[in-house]
Each structure stands twice: as C-alpha cells, then as structure tokens.
A protein has these predicted regions:
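A beta-rich soluble binding module of mature secreted/lumenal proteins
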Residues: 1-140
Length: 140
C-alpha cells in the first residue's frame, strides 16, 4: 500500500468501538524501513472534544500488497489498499481489512468532491462492501 508521506484525512469508515464518536480524524503512515511503518491516528471525541491518539506499527508484505498492523504486540490485523486514484500523487485511497468488516476512505484533504466520492462508492460497492454502513466523518 502506497500510504507513506504525510497526513491522510478519514472521509468515511465502518464504525467500530475503537473509533466510534471520533471526529476530525486523520492518520499518518510513516515508512521506517523498506518493510516497516509507524502509524499514528488522531481525532477528537465528538462529545467532549478531548484528543484521541493511538499508534501502531505496521509491516509490509514482500509484495507490498498487504500491511500487517499491530497496536499491541500479540495482535495483528491485515489491511490492503483496495482502491485508489490513478494520479502519481495519490489524493485518495480505500483501505480495507481481509473481511468486509473494516473499511476506510482516506484523502489528502478533509473533503472530497461529490463526483469523486460517488466514483469511490461505486468501486467499493463492486467489491462487495455495504456502503450503507459507512459513517462519514465530521472533519471539524
């Protein structure tokens, strides 16, 4: 997954307890070596305004198709970049888990145009994801 190089804003996601109620969320993927990454997630609790920050380590597969992420030493989850724009400088990506339970739409800016978002949602639906379950993130 080509996620290195700065900040990505969370446009939409399948909500999970570890992110529920989070607004203004963004993530930074930082390449540490050829196969290792540091991942930092930041957002705010939508009710209290308190910062929510978490970090994880990631390891890229040999073919760079999968990112194995661990937020604690014994538990790993695998993620793939299931869709992205075709620009040399990626402006948006869709990251998904191995199952249909995990999905994030990330972008370089806090908002995407309606035209781009409709195209992304079409691609996501073709891959079998239920877009009705997407939670669109308030980027305050």
């Amino acid at each position: 997954p080509d996620l290195d190089g700065g900040e990505w804003y969370e446009i939409a996601r399948f909500d999970h307890p570890f992110q529920e109620g989070t607004v203004g969320s963004r993530v930074v993927y930082r390449l540490l070596s050829e196969s290792r990454m540091r991942i930092v997630y930041r957002g705010k609790d939508g009710r209290t305004g308190r910062d929510r920050i978490s970090s994880a380590k990631g390891r890229l597969s040999a073919d760079y198709e999968c990112l194995r992420v661990s937020s604690c030493w014994f538990f790993y989850s695998d993620y793939t970049m299931s869709a992205c724009d075709s620009a040399a400088e990626r402006q948006w990506v869709v990251v998904s888990g191995r199952s249909a339970k995990y999905l994030w739409i990330l972008a370089r800016r806090p908002r995407l145009s309606t035209q781009v978002l409709v195209r992304i949602l079409g691609q996501v639906e073709k891959q079998g994801f239920d877009t009705d379950k997407l939670h669109f993130v308030d980027q305050r």
